[in-house]
């Protein structure tokens, strides 16, 4: 849990809203509200990505936003999630991305804790798949 805000940080929340048919609720939007209202994180430090359908596209789409906003590709980013999901990201997600997306949009960095790991954006994330109708 964040105990303070560092003004050099940006928070990305990536979660698709339409995995529930007819739902108007979006986890990324709700998490943004929580960060602003409960943790006093400035709104301009929060970037949401509501299009990803699963972890492969979560990371790919976040890397695209990192590029779009001119953030450096040589600086580590941090994923924060459950322990099991974090282990999957660092151990098997690259192979899954290659299989499902035909590219790996990140390079693993250091494991920081059971629930946190570094990654570095990869330029391959910028490839658009013309056969994928939901590829933003």
Model-identified regions with their sequence ranges:
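A structural signal for short, hydrophobic/glycine-enriched beta-strand patches
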Residues: 1-136
